[in-house]
Amino acid sequence: LMPETVARRYREGEENISTQHRDVSVIYAQLLGFEAFSRSLPSEESVSMLNSLVEAFDEAAERHGVEHVRSMQDTGLLATCGLVVPRIDHASRTIAFAKELAQIVGRFNDQHDAGLAIRVGIDSGPVTSGLVGERSTIYALWGEAVDLAHRVHAATKSAGIFVSDRVHDAVVGIYPFTAAGTVSDAAGTERVWRLDVANRQPA
């Protein structure tokens, strides 16, 4: 993902491009179990299956107005909502997106007799985006919401959809949650909440 406005500034020769975003939801999602599942498969088949999952994730992102920023090396993805297109309901959109990711994984498991799962961490707050690097320029995100979303995602090894206090407070009347511990951040301790959702992925 590189917004067209950023790409245009880059093509015009502008350097040190960055933008402050006051309120954005950030999603870290990691697919669990794919490496073990694909170990016995021919490489072409495993790549094809992974591509089908990534394509389904991208289609889900488009449906929910979520922006896929980049794929991660550990079969994960970093995404945002409200970054390129400001959205008042960015928190609830990310929850709906995360739920659909779990459903996609569940269908994959049914079709391929697999035992994959997904772990998602979400936070909302200020984000800075910009181009970094000289020889290999990439569009990157940093800031409080990016850091905390990653901490929430990494707070447990279990599958599930985990959110920060800010996301919980924004959607608590819409979705049910269970307390799932705490993580440390720059301001101290942050509660983590797990979305109560019936899905077909192993815990």
What does each model-identified segment do?
Residues S46-L53, T94-F97, L101, E144-L148:
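Hydrophobic alpha-helical membrane-association signature
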Residues L1-R22, S48:
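Regulatory cytosolic signal-relay segments
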Residues A7, F34, M72, L77, ...:
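A generic structural signal for short hydrophobic patches within well-formed alpha-helices
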Residues E4, R8, S25, A29-E35:
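Conserved nucleotide-binding and Mg2+-coordinating catalytic segments in signaling enzymes
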Residues V24, A29, A60-R93, V105-E144, ...:
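Catalytic core of nucleotidyl cyclases, primarily class III adenylyl/guanylyl cyclases
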Residues V105-Q111, D123-S124, E144-D169:
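Catalytic/regulatory signature loops of cyclic-dinucleotide turnover enzymes
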Residues V127-S129, A155-A203:
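Cytosolic regulatory/linker segments at or just downstream of nucleotide-handling modules
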Residues R22, E35-D58, E62, E67-S71:
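Conserved long alpha-helical elements within nucleotide-processing catalytic cores of c-di-GMP signaling
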